[in-house]
């Protein structure tokens, strides 16, 4: 992994993308009951489409280098916790020297696993923790690089509003946009 910029590590963040209109109910009348079937619905989870108050959403999990260029991307449904997509993203790159992430990634197992591998973990502790872990505030300021990467990613209309039904089609568009961002950055 190429180390450039002031921080020699990776940044991590998940971002939600809405799919369709807010009142889109997938062809069902709003007062109609759920269809009779056993087990969980197929299709939506496999296509990384989740439901939340804002409608159907998808999370893009991204890992960037110190220059804000995307290294690894993956999709999960919008209601899934951020740690769900973390394993897939971290498996695609070698262990970074520094990992900067937001509070949603504050988990003891994650900290221990990355510290064992020699990675410095910079994650602000969850305010409900009894024993908060130490973190470097100055190094955490570099997290805005991933926010700017997501801003550049959402400049592409197809990424900002998900028009694709299938997750692999949408992910290919995200990866194509990430390639353009890498090339221009």
Model-found features: residue ranges?
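Short alpha-helical elements
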Residues: 1-185
